[in-house]
Structure formats: C-alpha cells, structure tokens
C-alpha cells in the first residue's frame, strides 16, 4: 500500500532540506529576504515567514510544471551556479551532465548548435534527414546563460519551446513533454538584443540578483574556494530528489485549493493593469499613457493604475499568478491559497512583463526599480480590491439568480470611479438579470444542495446545446465544478500495475481503451474527457516502482468508474 499523505510530507521536507543545505554549506550566499504573509488558521491571524528571496523563488520555479524563470542581474552574482546546484539536488543529474546541457547565449549561436544536427552518415548514404537532438532539447533541467545575447531568430526557436512545447529542425519535430527552465540575463551587458514582449511573457517568474552585501562577501571570502576543491556531489551537493519525485510534487501542487476571493483578486490585478476608459491598450499602437493619452481623463488620479502602465497583462499572467501561489502555499504546508500569498508572489510574476510609464517609474523612492514599483502597484490594487468588495458580492448574487432590488443602483454609483465595475461587473449583472437565467441558477443551486447529480448533468447538457443562454459559460462551469466536488476521487498505484489498470478500464469502458493506454505509456500528465467523465493521469516515471496518480470526476459513469477502481486491491484511494 502507498501512504500518500506521508509521501507528500516527505517530499515537502526534502524541498526544505534543499534550501537548508544550500544555505548551510554556503553554496549561495545572499542576505536579501522576502516576507511571506499568510493566514494561520490555527491561531486565526495573519503571520509572516521570512525566506531567502533568490533561493526560495528559484526553488518555487522547480515546483511549478513546465516552468520558466528569468534571473536578472550583473555578471558574477552566482545566477548560473545556483541553478546548476539546484538541478543536481532536484533531479540527481551529475553537475557535469547539467553543465553539458547549458546553452551559452551569443549572437553567433546557430540553430544547429541550439537544437540539433543531422546524422551525416544517414544523410550521405540514404539521403534521409535524421535529427540528433541536442542535450538542451532532450534534457529535463534546462539552463540558458545570457539569454539576451541570443538573436531574435534564436529567441523565436525558444519561444516555440516555451509556447508549444515543441522544437523543429528541418522537417523533424520533437515534443518536450516535461521540463524546468532557467534563463539568466545581464541588462547592462554590451552586444545584447531586446527581448520581445511575447518572449518575456513566456517566463512565469523573475527575480533581481543584486550584488552581495559586505557581510555576504565576508562569508564568501572565508568560505571554501570551489575553484580549488570543486563540489563534493555526495555531501555538499547530494541528490535529494529525482525527476519522478518532482513530477509527484507537481501533482500535489496542482491539487492545491484556493479561495473564491483569490480568483476575483487575480482578475482584479489583470484588469486594473489592462483597462482604459479611452482605448483598448492591447490594440492601440501609438496612444499610450506615456504619450499623453490620460490628459484630462476622469480616471487620471494617483489612486488609479491605468495611467501608470503602457502595456497590458496577458491571460498567461493570471495563470502564472495562480500556479506560483499554489507552489508557495504547498511549500508552506497551507490548506489553501489566500490573497496574502498572491500578494507575496505577484511582483516577481509581473515586473518583467509590463511596460510602465517612465515618468512614474523613475520617481522617488523607486528610481527605475521595476520590482519595487510593482510592489507599490500591487498595494494600490489590494486597497482598491477590498474597497470594491461589495460589488463582487452583488455579482455573486446575480450569478446565483438572487439579486437585491437596489443592487444595480449600487453598482452604477461604484462605476463612476472604478473601471472594473464600469466595464466588467455592471455589464455582466445587466446581462444576467433575465428571469430565465435566475430560474435556472436557482435550480442548479437546489440540485447542488440535494446532491442530485442527474439533474445537474441534465442542466449541463441543456446549456451545452443552447448557445444564446445568458452567461452560459459560467453556468456550465458551475455544473462541472459541483459534479467534480461530489464525485472526485484520487487513486495511486505503482507503474508495475499500469497494464492491469488499462485492461480493467478498457474492458468496462471500451471508448477509453486507446486514450488510457496512451496516457499511461510514458512520463506525462494527461486529461481524458468524455461526455460525463473527466480523468486526469499523472505518470511520474516508467520504473516498476514509479508512482502513478489517477483522478476521476464527472457524472454517472464517473461513479461507475470509481467503483471499478475501488475494487482493485493494488490501487490506493486517497
């Protein structure tokens, strides 16, 4: 039997051990810290935990599936060394292997040196183009040193990897299923190229690397000289985790719950930075706050965000805010993500992806520091979000089909000074005030409270076929979420039983034969969706002892599948 709770706790302890070991052995010395605010449910109050900023954020990046991170700072700050050591500890790869897979950015770096080369023997003998992929492409732990020295063409190759998980060379295409990527950047370096906004947007998080303080330098100088002795891979930089273990951590991180207000708050961050009363910032080429767009505008005040930002924030930013918040909440062993956790991580997720109005950015006390200015922006967003709280409550009542008589009047008052209420909340509430919407919303609510899965499934099927129903997407999602909550079941088994599981499921559900077979065939995470069943599989590795997670949710067939899996003695139900 597999003790999944003990396994999760053991994995978390190993991650903390990595942080402690790097600090204790002085493998990376930097005194700058990050304050993490979180709500302690036991003591019923908000607490603060102090963590080493650079090291902790680099570790968080490894806990997020298929993640990419930018380390921004001058040369000699230990950026590349740190991620090499983390690669050794998190994957068990030798330092020499990690070194061989590093891409060193420079303008002469060709596509062949970055991605792969043709097998010359086959090409000359048979005329066949067979690609031998570079270790950077095939390896799990990827490092790009000085990414801003890559030409725009080389950046496009990496963009394909980050955006689609695919790399192309000649007519060959390889899929990069799972990876963790780190890129270093020295903004002051000569001979560099500008990184495009779409390219920067693919990096989920970034951290500024400042030079060590006097005390840090003292510790560094009195410590061991790695140039002379090297690193002891058994004691100083031991293997603590493996790729299989990291895949298991990804599964646990993805399952982290988050409060409803976190959903609203992340929306607020994105929309505060994107909305404008005059133009669509995403499609406006010349009109920007920095070019005089905000002159004479009613919303051009110190308490607004829109007049301080030239660019927009993409949907990817919203997803990354949640991903990294989940990773941080999991690492701190919290039950769920709250707004405090999002606030702690937001400056590092946003700062490298946004273009601020220079006049605002260069004011005291920021002096051009995008990270500090982003923290200031998040503080404003936070205040405005809590001032707007009654409007979210009104929107919830409209969603549930039970609005109050004066709710629209209240929203109209807020809309005079709040762009989110004016362009998002108020139009939404007006759109769903129809009687047929309220009637169906109340029906869904009753089905939820009574646990009537059949009724929920019927409502969902009706909505799928009715393209004109107001706020249809929300109601379908509501049904899906409630079906998920009432039927979700998690199972764990060893990879040695993957064929048995496949046969059992395929025998009872022939339509799942091929999808299940493919999902369990290699290390990967897959979702399989039928009309009323959602299956998520997570194969951490293909060794006999590797752990496989499978989650079932949906309607009547999901319950039938759950009963089948519960009857298998080699499966552990969580």
Where are these regions (language model features)?
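Walker A/P-loop
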Residues: 60, 64-105
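Canonical AAA+ ATPase core
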Residues: 69, 90, 121-124, 141, ...
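Short glycine-rich substrate-engagement loop in P-loop NTPases that contacts/grips substrate
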Residues: 106-137
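Conserved, well-folded catalytic cores of nucleic-acid-processing
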Residues: 21-25, 61-65, 89-93, 117-121, ...
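Short loop/turn elements that form and flank the Walker-type P-loop nucleotide-binding site
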Residues: 64-66, 77, 136-138, 175-179
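Pre-Walker A (pre-P-loop) alpha-helix and adjacent loop at the N terminus of AAA/AAA+ ATPase modules
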Residues: 7-74
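C-terminal engagement/docking regions of AAA+ P-loop ATPases
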Residues: 76, 81, 283-491, 495-516, ...
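Conserved C-terminal "switch" segment of AAA+ ATPases
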Residues: 8-32, 209-297, 334
């Amino acid at each position: 039997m597999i003790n999944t709770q003990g396994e999760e706790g053991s994995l978390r302890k190993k991650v903390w051990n990595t942080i402690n070991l790097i600090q204790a052995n002085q493998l990376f010395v930097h005194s700058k810290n990050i304050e993490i605010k979180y709500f302690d449910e036991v003591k019923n109050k908000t607490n603060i935990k102090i963590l080493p900023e650079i090291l902790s954020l680099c570790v968080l990046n490894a806990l997020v599936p298929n993640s990419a991170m930018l380390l921004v700072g001058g040369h000699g700050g230990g950026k590349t060394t740190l991620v090499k050591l983390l690669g050794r500890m998190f994957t068990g790869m030798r330092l020499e292997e990690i070194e061989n897979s590093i891409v060193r950015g420079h303008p002469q770096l060709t596509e062949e040196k970055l991605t792969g080369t043709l097998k010359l023997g086959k090409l000359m003998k048979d005329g066949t183009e067979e690609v031998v992929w570079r270790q950077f492409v095939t390896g799990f732990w990827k490092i790009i040193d000085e990414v801003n020295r890559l030409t725009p063409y080389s950046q496009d190759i990496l963009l394909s990897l980050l955006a689609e998980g695919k790399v192309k060379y000649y007519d060959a295409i390889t899929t990069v299923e799972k990876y963790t990527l780190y890129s270093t950047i020295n903004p002051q370096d000569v001979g560099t190229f500008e990184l495009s906004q779409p390219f920067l947007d693919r990096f989920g998080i970034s951290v500024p690397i400042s030079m060590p303080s006097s005390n840090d330098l003292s510790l560094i100088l009195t410590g061991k000289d790695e140039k002379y002795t090297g690193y002891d891979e058994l004691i100083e930089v031991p293997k603590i985790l493996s790729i299989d273990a990291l895949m298991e951590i990804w599964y646990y991180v993805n399952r982290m719950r988050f409060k409803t207000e976190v959903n609203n708050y992340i929306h607020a961050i994105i929309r505060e930075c994107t909305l404008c009363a005059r133009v669509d910032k995403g499609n406006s080429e010349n009109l920007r706050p920095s070019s005089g767009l905000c002159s004479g505008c009613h919303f051009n005040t110190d308490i607004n965000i829109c007049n301080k930002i030239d660019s927009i924030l993409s949907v990817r930013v919203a997803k990354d805010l949640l991903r990294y918040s989940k990773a941080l909440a999991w690492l701190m062993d919290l039950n769920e993500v709250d707004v405090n956790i999002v606030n702690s991580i937001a400056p590092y997720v946003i700062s490298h992806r946004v273009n601020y109005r220079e006049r605002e950015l260069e004011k005291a006390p920021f002096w051009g520091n995008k990270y500090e200015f982003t923290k200031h922006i998040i503080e404003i967003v936070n205040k405005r979000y809590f001032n707007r709280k009654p409007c979210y409550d009104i929107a919830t009542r409209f969603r549930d089909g039970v609005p109050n008589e004066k709710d629209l009047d209240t929203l109209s008052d807020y809309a005079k000074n709040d762009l989110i209420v004016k362009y998002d909340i108020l139009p939404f509430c007006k759109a769903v005030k129809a009687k047929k919407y309220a009637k169906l919303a109340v029906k869904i609510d009753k089905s939820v409270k009574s646990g009537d899965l059949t009724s929920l499934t019927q409502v969902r099927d009706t909505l799928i076929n009715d393209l004109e129903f107001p706020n249809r997407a929300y109601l379908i999602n509501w049904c899906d979420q409630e079906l998920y909550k009432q039927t979700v079941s998690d199972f764990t088994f060893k990879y040695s039983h993957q064929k048995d599981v496949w046969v059992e499921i395929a025998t009872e559900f022939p339509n799942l034969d091929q999808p299940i077979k493919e999902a369990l065939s290699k290390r990967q995470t897959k979702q399989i969706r039928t009309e009323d069943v959602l299956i998520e599989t997570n194969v951490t590795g293909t060794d006999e002892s590797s752990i496989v997670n499978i989650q079932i949710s949906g309607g009547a067939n999901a319950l039938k599948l759950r009963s089948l899996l519960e009857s298998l003695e080699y499966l552990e139900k969580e």
